[in-house]
């Protein structure tokens, strides 16, 4: 369960820590805003890793794709600059309609605590929630969030001042009104963001992930390194993850979709052609679903009955969650039938072979990003979690798709053979963590910078003194330009790649370093 749904998260965790003892590993499922840090007073080891998931996926996104992909989604009639306003309206709708019973109960609590009621009190609560950009804001380190939100709400809607004053008076005393306001805040955020907005934003859907912020087009290397170093210092035992039971897409599906940031012109051409041949019932819905179809499309082009069923199930869930033309509470069967018919046309018509060709063209780049993400998740500061089935390529979408039974027999065979690149990375990194625990759990994080024309295509860092990790990114552009004398300066000593056995020292050419795989896991010899 999410931490923020509890009435007293801090008190609960204090009791849990006392019960389990000082050495028990406790991490909390907490969705952090981009500008929010985990509360340092909580007696836990960290979060379950949605924050790290955003950082890893984001650092592999090509920023050059932002403008053309924004233009593409706006060609479908969306003003992308209005997305924040849309999200704010969704929060109000969630409070007033979806969670109306909770809002009524909160109103009664506030009125009782403040000793007065007002007709505008429910509207004031809903408007206030528009301005709280996180799931919960009553942790000690966030004491300034609520008064700032009250000020912003008063500034934009001064007519709600009487209701806002009642809220402030009731919440200041703590107790049930304060608790229920925070619980409603988290529920409203979940309904508006995860359960609706993430199904409307069709710019680059790999960014529409739990803990994500799609309006930020990826994560720069500076931000990535700073957040990793901070985690090493403050939360070295926090969890890192790429896939969970709640992620909107599996890690490898996100990696493939993320490649579209590198080829926006190619994707725009495909979408334009697709819309001419098989126009979607709604252009934005079509762009959203096309990215997901691309993300799970088999390299062979052979769409099994199982995949067809999974895609139809996903499409129906997606359009109901988006709640533009249909919804769970008010299904529009005609629109849903049109979407299912369109999807069958996509799967069976001439576009299927074109999509197969596009997937084949980009698959090596998708696999490169997937390997990079996996190695980063296993080696950045924190304790890595490997979600069920993600040891090999995984084509899962949202639940229940990501909760299918795992074929452990196939994975046991792959682990023994160590031929699959993903399980090679996984096995090597986990073995290294076991033999060098001081480098990972206690070791510092130090960025390492490549030098040369293609330096931006490398993300590298040291863990402790004896482990160096480097991954490749933006490989479509890299394929065109080549490494062009780019080097990675290795610290003193001789280094061996735990994945390939390649040995290097000093200023090592990137073309040699990444000759076999797009990632390296270097260990200092005799360490």
PLM ranges: what are they?
Residues 8-80, 87, 93-99, 113-119, ...:
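Carbohydrate-interacting/catalytic domains
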Residues 109:
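Conserved AAA+ ATPase "sensor/coupling" helix adjacent to the nucleotide-binding pocket
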Residues 133:
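Acidic/aromatic/glycine-rich contiguous surface patches that form carbohydrate-binding/processing clefts
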Residues 130:
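Short polybasic/polar patches that bind polyanions
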Residues 1-6:
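Conserved short loop/turn motifs at secondary-structure junctions
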């Amino acid at each position: 369960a999410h931490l923020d749904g509890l009435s007293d998260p801090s008190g609960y965790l204090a009791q849990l820590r006392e019960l389990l003892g000082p050495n028990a590993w406790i991490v909390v499922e907490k969705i952090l805003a981009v500008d929010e840090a985990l509360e340092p007073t909580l007696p836990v080891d960290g979060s379950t890793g949605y924050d790290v998931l955003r950082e890893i996926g984001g650092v592999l996104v090509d920023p050059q794709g932002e403008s053309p992909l924004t233009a593409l989604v706006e060609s479908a009639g969306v003003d992308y600059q209005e997305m924040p306003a849309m999200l704010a309206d969704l929060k109000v709708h969630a409070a007033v309609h979806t969670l109306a019973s909770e809002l009524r109960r909160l109103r009664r609590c506030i009125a009782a605590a403040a000793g007065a009621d007002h007709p505008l009190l429910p509207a004031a609560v809903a408007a206030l929630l528009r301005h709280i950009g996180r799931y919960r804001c009553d942790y000690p380190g966030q004491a300034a969030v609520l008064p700032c939100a009250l000020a912003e709400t008063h500034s934009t809607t001064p007519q709600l001042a009487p209701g806002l004053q009642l809220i402030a008076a009731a919440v200041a005393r703590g107790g049930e009104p304060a608790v229920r306001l925070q619980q409603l805040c988290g529920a409203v955020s979940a309904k508006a963001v995860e359960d609706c907005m993430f199904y409307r934003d069709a710019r680059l859907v790999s960014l529409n992930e739990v803990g994500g912020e799609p309006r930020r087009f990826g994560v720069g290397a500076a931000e990535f390194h700073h957040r990793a170093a901070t985690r090493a210092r403050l939360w070295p035992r926090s969890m890192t993850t790429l896939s969970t039971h709640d992620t909107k897409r599996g890690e490898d599906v996100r990696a493939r979709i993320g490649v579209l940031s590198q080829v926006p012109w190619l994707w725009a051409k495909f979408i334009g052609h697709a819309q001419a041949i098989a126009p979607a019932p709604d252009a934005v819905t079509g762009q959203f679903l096309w990215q997901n179809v691309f993300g799970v499309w088999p390299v062979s082009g052979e769409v099994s009955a199982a995949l067809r069923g999974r895609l139809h199930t996903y499409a129906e869930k997606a359009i109901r969650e988006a709640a533009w033309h249909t919804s769970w509470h008010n299904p529009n069967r005609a629109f849903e039938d049109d979407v299912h018919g369109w999807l069958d046309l996509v799967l069976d018509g001439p576009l299927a072979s074109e999509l197969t060709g596009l997937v084949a063209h980009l698959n090596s780049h998708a696999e490169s990003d997937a390997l990079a993400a996996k190695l980063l998740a296993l080696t950045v500061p924190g304790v890595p979690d490997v979600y069920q089935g993600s040891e090999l390529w995984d084509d899962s979408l949202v639940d229940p798709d990501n909760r299918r039974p795992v074929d452990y027999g196939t994975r046991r065979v792959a682990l023994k053979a160590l031929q699959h690149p993903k399980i090679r990375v996984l096995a090597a990194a986990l073995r290294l963590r076991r033999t060098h625990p001081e480098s990972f759990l206690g070791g510092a994080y130090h960025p390492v910078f490549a030098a040369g024309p293609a330096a931006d295509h490398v993300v590298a860092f040291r863990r402790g003194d004896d482990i160096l990790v480097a991954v490749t990114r933006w490989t479509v552009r890299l394929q065109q330009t080549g490494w062009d004398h780019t080097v990675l300066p290795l610290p003193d000593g001789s280094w061996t790649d735990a994945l390939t056995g390649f040995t290097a020292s000093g200023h090592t050419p990137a073309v040699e370093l990444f000759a076999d795989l797009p990632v390296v896991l270097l260990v200092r010899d005799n360490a």
